[in-house]
């Protein structure tokens, strides 16, 4: 997979739309697994997942949707990307 970085890396110390990203690269740098929640711009929960520590996850979302970490959000690194399956 090829990725194109489209913005500066940030974290989830507070709710973020990650520069209005539709695709996000997320790295949980904390020592434990963390719960990540996706919400609409109106703050309605769409869903959540557990991000294992030390793992990278690629998430698709709507531009105005936000991501939050249940705790230790400063340890969760996020960046807006584009991707391709080309090798």
PLM feature segments, named:
Residues 40-73:
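Intrinsically disordered, low-complexity Pro/Gly/Ser/Thr-rich segments with frequent PxxP/GP/PP motifs
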Residues 74-87:
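Exposed low-complexity, polar/acidic, P/S/T/G-rich flexible segments that act as propeptides
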């Amino acid at each position: 997979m090829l990725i194109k970085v489209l913005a500066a890396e940030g974290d989830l110390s507070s709710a973020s739309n990650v520069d209005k990203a539709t695709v996000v690269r997320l790295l949980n740098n904390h020592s434990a697994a963390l719960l990540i929640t996706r919400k609409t711009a109106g703050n309605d929960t769409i869903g959540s997942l557990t991000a294992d520590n030390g793992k990278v996850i690629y998430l698709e979302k709507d531009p105005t949707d936000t991501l939050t970490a249940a705790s230790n959000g400063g340890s969760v690194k996020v960046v807006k990307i584009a991707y391709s399956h080309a090798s």
